[in-house]
Amino acid sequence: MVINIQPDEIGSIIRKQIKGYVPEMKVVNIGTVLQVGDGIARIHGLDEVMAGELVEFEDGTVGIALNLESDNVGAVLMGDGLTIREGGSVRATGKIAQIPVSDSFLGRVVNALAQPIDGKGQIPASEFRLIESSAPGIISRRSVYEPLQTGLIAIDSMIPIGRGQRELIIGDRQTGKTAVATDTILNQKGQNVICVYVAIGQKASSVAQVVDTFRERGALEYTIVVSETANSPATLQYLAPYTGAALAEYFMYRKQHTLIIYDDLSKQAQAYRQMSLLLKRPPGREAYPGDVFYLHSRLLERAAKLSTQLGEGSMTALPIVETQAGDVSAYIPTNVISITDGQIFLSADLFNAGIRPAINVGISVSRVGSAAQIKAMKQVAGKLKLELAQFAELEAFAQFASDLDKTTQNQLARGQRLRELLKQSQSAPLAVEEQVATIYTGVNGYLDVLDVEQVKRFLVQLREYVATSKPSFGEIIRSTKVFTEQAEALLKEAIKESTELFLLQER
């Protein structure tokens, strides 16, 4: 069979194809690696790269362009960079660092790039958020007015925290800073608060322990853990808090309440110092770079209570900072104190004396939270701080005086019982009605008949007694948020009956 080829037809088909051809040109911004090491790469070329833009190396490692100099670009690596070689090519991606976000992140442990590290498979994501995004402006905010209960009597009564506040937790190592933060997360169960715990430069074993606590206590279902351990590259330790903030913002802008804990910002500052010094940026005080204040301020300003127009979502931040030998006047502590709305100061001396949580009530303050305290708490806790302050003065004086008058002795005895009342075991947060009952008992002298070592046992028994035999007391406090006369009468009855019962048992 002979095929008859028509040259005209073929010619017209070719002409048609040529007409329909769209020439495509892809312009890629390419550079060459000059030098690599210590998590830093110096790159020649990349002329049009932006500050903070992601760059991709031949082996797939991603970096962030931070130093844009006249003849080279300094990039920090998000990985070990062991397979990057001198002379290799680098491509500018045209993107700024962003992470996937969705509700599926709840209950998961992720790294600073929001990739899962808990071995439970990929996390489905619906959208992306920039890791660094600008904080809400003045018009987008409203003042803090709702309480965020931590479950710790000392904090909720005297250093209250409101939703949308930034409250610093500061103290030496091993003074229970993480315990205060994790107890606050445990206390959010059933409160419709999404929690984000960011672990920066911690031991992997410590992070695993915290995750286990959350899982055992049913707190992991409303919590996201972002972790970059001590062996992670400095770049990822520096990014982790911003990733946590981006995850919390996703929920905040969807009209939900969020709580974020940065544990701790001293390690983030150290990672940033390492990066800056390797990039040859000029060092400042304590060898930190000049913009270390901005590093923390732009992070903590993202915590806010949003306006009614934006749905009244909130993001409460509890940054943790470690001090050396109680020195609050070092560079990073003073910076973060000036950015936050108050601080909870944990003292090693109190911790070693068995007063836990080791909160130094004298120098801890909340500059916002008192506006967010419920009325019932304001009614009973007003006298508490004053009595404890007077007790601290008297105690110092009583060390030198031998014969004290009866009034002073009574005041000292009351102070010791109040201090006992503030002690709490770890992972045992108290509901607000239990706190109100506890403080009322102490401030009104109902503990004076007991020995100091009996106080803790009695209070546990009293709280159980109120919950079982006077359930309406808790209902009144929860529903009205006020310590009414009816509630007071119920509580007085419960204290009287419980004290009689307790003293009988002790005999």
Swiss-Prot record:
One of its GO terms (molecular function) is ATP binding. It is found in: Plastid, Chloroplast thylakoid membrane. It is an enzyme of class 7 (translocase). It catalyses: ATP + H2O + 4 H(+)(in) = ADP + phosphate + 5 H(+)(out). Keywords: ATP synthesis, ATP-binding, CF(1), Chloroplast, Hydrogen ion transport, Ion transport, Membrane, Nucleotide-binding, Plastid, Thylakoid, Translocase, Transport. It is a peripheral membrane protein. InterPro entries: ATP_synth_asu-like_sf, ATP_synth_asu_C, ATP_synth_asu_C_sf, ATP_synth_F1_a_nt-bd_dom, ATP_synth_F1_asu, ATPase_a/bsu_AS, ATPase_F1/V1/A1_a/bsu_N, ATPase_F1/V1/A1_a/bsu_N_sf. Pfam families: ATP-synt_ab, ATP-synt_ab_C, ATP-synt_ab_N. Its EC number is 7.1.2.2. The record marks S364 as: Required for activity. Belongs to the ATPase alpha/beta chains family. F-type ATPases have 2 components, CF(1) - the catalytic core - and CF(0) - the membrane proton channel. CF(1) has five subunits: alpha(3), beta(3), gamma(1), delta(1), epsilon(1). CF(0) has four main subunits: a, b, b' and c. Produces ATP from ADP in the presence of a proton gradient across the membrane. The alpha chain is a regulatory subunit. This is ATP synthase subunit alpha, chloroplastic. The lineage of its organism: Eukaryota, Viridiplantae, Streptophyta, Embryophyta, Tracheophyta. The gene is atpA.
